[in-house]
UniProtKB/Swiss-Prot annotation:
Source organism (scientific name): Accipiter gentilis
Role played: Involved in oxygen transport from the lung to the various peripheral tissues.
One Pfam family matching this protein: Globin
Similarity-based family: Belongs to the globin family.
UniProt: heme b binding residues: 63, 92
Name of the molecule in the record: Hemoglobin subunit beta
Oligomer status and interactors: Heterotetramer of two alpha chains and two beta chains.
GO molecular function list: haptoglobin binding; heme binding; metal ion binding; organic acid binding; oxygen binding; oxygen carrier activity; peroxidase activity
Amino acid sequence: VQWAAEEKQLITGLWGKVNVADCGAEALARLLIVYPWTQRFFASFGNLSSATAVLGNPMVRAHGKKVLTSFGEAVKNLDNIKNTFAQLSELHCDKLHVDPENFRLLGDILIVVLAAHFGKDFSPDCQAAWQKLVRAVAHALARKYH
């Protein structure tokens, strides 16, 4: 992926304001609520029977933070995203058997969460840069599948 200087600035500038715990928890919770079939990968998390249960589930919150913390590695390594996610791609493919389409869905959900949290600061140019980033991360995570 080739990044313009402006794209890098938009991504890193916004990332510096992101509350990883809150945004990560919200993104994973939204994924599980909006796309309920993704819950099958989180059976060990206990009660995911309703939106209220998902939103209040401490395991969802903790894993959401872990996911978004990992996403931060992409922000730090914009020019080497494929290698940054090589091990996670292998884990999700070989051991967890996650449908790679779910990575794209989570990326789209993250865009919604960022827009909700940052409003006007999440300008169309900023959204375009972040959309490019979430696509690159989803592609890197799906790499082991091909």
